[in-house]
Amino acid sequence: MSGVLNDVRDYTEGYLQVLWQNRLYVYSTAAVLIGVWFTVNMLFKKKKMVHPVSPLASKSVKKQEPASEAKKVIYVSGVKVFYGSQTGTAKGFAKELAEDVIAQGIQCEVIDMKDFDPEDRLAEECTSKIICVFLVATYTDGQPTESAEWFCKWLEEASTDFRYGKTYLKGMRYAVFGLGNSVYVGHFNTVSKSIDKWLWMLSAARIMTRGEGDCNVVKSRHGSVQADFQVWKGKFLNRLQALAKGEKKACSGNCKKASCKNKKKHKEEAEDNHSLAEKNNSEEELMESSSDEESSSEDEKSHGSVIDMEDLGNVMNHMKKAKQRMEEDEEDSQRVKQNGERKSECEEERREMITPALRDSLTKQGYKLIGSHSGVKLRRWTKSMLRGRGGCYKHTFYGIESHRCMETTPSLACANKCVFCWRHHTNPVGTEWRWKMDPAEKIIQEAMENHRNMIRQFRGVPGVRPERFEEGLTVKHCALSLVGEPIMYPEINSFLKLLHQQNISSFLVTNAQFPEEIRSLVPVTQLYVSVDASTKDSLKKIDRPLFKDFWQRFLDSLRALGEKQQRTVYRLTLVKAWNVDELKAYADLIALGQPDFIEVKGVTYCGESSASSLTMANVPWHEEVIYFVQQLANLLPDYEIACEHEHSNCLLLANHKFKVDGEWWTWIDYERFQELIQQYEESGGTKNFSAMDYMAKTPSWAVFGAGERGFDPTDTRFQRKNKTKDISGC
């Protein structure tokens, strides 16, 4: 037995010794066999991936269709539209979008950001299969509106807070549309850009490119913010339909002949192009691309992403081509930008200032619009004086016949967005004239025709005095203070000359942001400058000017006013708790421009508006206005309170030069002014004249301290039984 075991052991040792001596050949054979097996396996796997579905398999799929239909997959369960609005535009867009989404058979909810707590509820949208839409406006200094302030604050902090993590909103799908004005350079649509960025940083998936609405019709891609939204809304609804059907992102058009036969391959190309964009573009530009590819690519990689050497070579080629295309596109864009500046300038100037939406809004407010940038409106005091119920404060201070005063403007655009704007910021804004321009002759002719037509509507109205009705058909005064900034109109001097040629006096109001235009202005009957605050900070807070150098422009405008020889006026609007505690600063500004008169008026409450935080609490009592003016007069040795109009909550400070032999001469001799301006024009501007040359005596009832308190005794005081607020202005 032991011998047999020895033989077996000897045989085994001999066999192993042979193998050891020939181990190199054994290893080589094994390596070849393994390589052949691996290659065959990979080839079989590749063929299986591209192999068409067999008829038998298709039959089995058809048999399973009823079961899949019974258990239908829901890709989009609904839409939530979040809005952050100040003037109501974003809110209106949100409601409009919701109606269109519901019309597609998809549930939709509109949510005001101020009523939504993102800390407790936003993460729920990651698993709800709901599409979140954010319609947000950019407010003062690039800040969010009051309603969106907390939402933005929380989202910004969460995007950089390690406790939330970078995947806090992973699974959430969203789209963003911003409302802004490109006139505010450096702050255009910053809120929408920030929200888009913060959501992306928390791994939320963008379903489409961020939309930007521009209130500046000159720069708006489609002519108005409403048109911008309509275009974006159409794209969103199409994208929503595709998502609801479970479709992936459509072909980008970069593939050959735009046919995506090999979807996987083209998606890889899109990812490669996207990665190149990430490397070459800034983070802000990255925000512009859709993140759909990112989410879909992750799904594909989870199924296995084995790439052989041939595919890797193709990918590298695609990356090189994509980089070349990007460089070429960048060069083309630079050439277009350089060569198209003059062309775009011309095209922008041809755009009309009044958009269809603005036209509808102003028409509802009672404006009679003229051409593409002008308007006329019947003043409240015009109607009052036609009935013999008293005139406006200009009648008390300067002798204007209110029923013969046409209130108009050749420019509905303004360079400020004042918090107390009695038009609730419905007018456009701008820092220079970039719109289509109508001739001055057309504006004046149509303004007078519209004014007369509005006067004619009072024929036969109870209480209207026949003699005043006939007088009202002939315009004697023109108040260029309706809305906007009339001095922006490039042909303002021609406009004023045409008024004077028709014996119409001119009262022009400017917001003190155009000093050069003030200097080059031809003589007017009376030139006003609005002085709404006395310090840089308070002026920025109240007027919200567009110019970055607004304070220097403001001071230069006051200096330019001081160079005028005709009648000049500072107009101060008192807003309680905003600008009533700056007496010394006001006195310094008055010394700078040395106006002939200073009007001090309590702010008029124009009703509740989302565009302003002012309430009735900000309206000073008349006694408070009197006290302010008395305190201001104590700081001004050359001025004294001359007139009062209690109904308008307004007082007039006048320079002592208009007090002759103890009596005030604040009224205007309008016939004498027309003679002087005619002589000035005939002499080519050499025969100048001053405010003292056409002053007239102020009646006793208009003087401060009189029992009438500024009410003309020839009229009858009328007290409304139903005291509704009038927002028609002065």
From Swiss-Prot:
FMN binds at residues 85-89, 176-208. Residues 79-237 form the Flavodoxin-like domain. Its EC number is 4.1.3.44. Keywords: 4Fe-4S, Iron, Iron-sulfur, Lyase, Metal-binding, Nucleotide-binding, S-adenosyl-L-methionine, tRNA processing. Residues 283-297 have a biased composition (Acidic residues). Residues 253-351 are annotated as: Disordered. It comes from the Eukaryota. Disulfide bonds: none annotated. It catalyses: N(1)-methylguanosine(37) in tRNA(Phe) + pyruvate + S-adenosyl-L-methionine = 4-demethylwyosine(37) in tRNA(Phe) + 5'-deoxyadenosine + L-methionine + CO2 + H2O. Residues 398-642 form the Radical SAM core domain. Its cofactor is [4Fe-4S] cluster. [4Fe-4S] cluster binds at C414, C418, C421. One of its GO terms (biological process) is wybutosine biosynthetic process. Belongs to the TYW1 family. This is S-adenosyl-L-methionine-dependent tRNA 4-demethylwyosine synthase TYW1. It comes from Danio rerio (Zebrafish). The gene is tyw1.
